[in-house]
Amino acid sequence: MKEKLIELVEKEYLRSDIPQFKAGDTIGVYYKVKEGNKERVQLFEGVVIRVNGGGVAKTFTVRKVTAGIGVERIIPVNSPNIDRIEVLKVGRVRRSKLYYLRGLSAKKARIKEIVK
């Protein structure tokens, strides 16, 4: 009974407009940013290094390298601050968590792409 009630409440907050992606894919996350009374959309583009959790609590971590510095952002999938997500490249990896990319240089951190 309790699980059904939780599922019913969670169903309202699940988003259906999010595409399927996995670790190794390069994605662009268009994130809504509020600055004072203005709101704008900011692009965060990088490689998904981790997908964690499920349901409403599902999150993913995106990593990009900017000016030689690695930047990671943990983003909730069902966040209302996400405008949209685009899958730019589908990567071919054999791991579900790509933490080893943190220690690699830019050229070695490249991921093979699946060509369709």
Swiss-Prot record:
Organism: Fusobacterium nucleatum subsp. nucleatum (strain ATCC 25586 / DSM 15643 / BCRC 10681 / CIP 101130 / JCM 8532 / KCTC 2640 / LMG 13131 / VPI 4355)
Entry annotated with the keyword Ribonucleoprotein: yes
Presence of the UniProt keyword Cytoplasm in the record: no
Family assignment from sequence similarity: Belongs to the bacterial ribosomal protein bL19 family.
Lineage of source species: Bacteria, Fusobacteriati, Fusobacteriota, Fusobacteriia, Fusobacteriales
Gene Ontology molecular function, alphabetical: structural constituent of ribosome
Described function: This protein is located at the 30S-50S ribosomal subunit interface and may play a role in the structure and function of the aminoacyl-tRNA binding site.
Protein name per its UniProtKB record: Large ribosomal subunit protein bL19
Pfam families: Ribosomal_L19
InterPro entries (UniProt xref): Ribosomal_bL19, Ribosomal_bL19_CS, Ribosomal_bL19_sf, Translation_prot_SH3-like_sf
Protein keywords: Ribonucleoprotein, Ribosomal protein
